[in-house]
């Protein structure tokens, strides 16, 4: 485990409440990976600088990069209202709907294209590494103490699939163990350099 879950939020410009919620979501994701034994199987990097196509760091970071023996996962974590709710996407906005009443909960959230930019940038910058690794990008809607919401076929801009924590853990559990090959060492060094410090 490289970096610190939630560290990138300290300089994000979000208000204190949003920072605390975001940090809680990232810490809970790390705990879920630990509980499933995935931190021993896979290599994780927390609060990774995103790059633009000119190789410059941009403000938005990647919450977590996870590397298996065959896949690099770029993961964005969302800690929104949950429980007995359904998440729906419409015109770039994420709506939270109460399952029992069908009423909308709170204001819709604008769905950022950051992960689409991250996928494009990393595909471009690390094309040589991606001859040996697949690149997968996910937005994970984390459960709160009220439980997990249900996703109604939600995609973030750039067709980035949104999944529940359970779905993400299931995908990761089917991955090969990280291998400390030359390629694996290159990935570790590269993402280590991109950690927010």
Give short role names for the model-derived ranges:
Residues 1-60, 67-72, 78-88, 93-197:
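Surface-exposed interaction regions that form or flank ligand-binding interfaces
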């Amino acid at each position: 485990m490289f970096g610190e879950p939630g560290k990138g939020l300290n300089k994000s410009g979000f208000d204190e409440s949003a920072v605390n919620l975001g940090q809680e979501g990232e810490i809970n994701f790390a705990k879920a990976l630990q509980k499933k034994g995935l931190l021993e199987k896979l290599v994780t990097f927390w609060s990774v600088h995103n790059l633009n196509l000119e190789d410059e760091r941009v403000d938005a970071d990647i919450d977590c990069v996870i590397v298996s023996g065959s896949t690099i996962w770029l993961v964005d974590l969302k800690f929104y209202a949950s429980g007995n709710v359904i998440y729906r996407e419409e015109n770039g906005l994420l709506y939270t709907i109460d399952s029992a009443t069908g009423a909308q909960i709170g204001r819709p959230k604008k769905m950022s294209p950051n992960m689409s930019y991250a996928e494009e940038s990393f595909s471009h910058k690390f094309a040589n590494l991606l001859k040996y690794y697949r690149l997968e990008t996910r937005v994970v809607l984390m459960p709160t103490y009220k439980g997990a919401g249900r996703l109604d076929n939600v995609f973030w801009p750039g067709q980035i699939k949104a999944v529940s924590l359970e779905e993400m853990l299931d995908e990761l559990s089917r991955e090969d163990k990280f291998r400390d090959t030359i390629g694996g060492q290159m990935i570790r060094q590269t993402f280590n350099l991109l950690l927010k410090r």
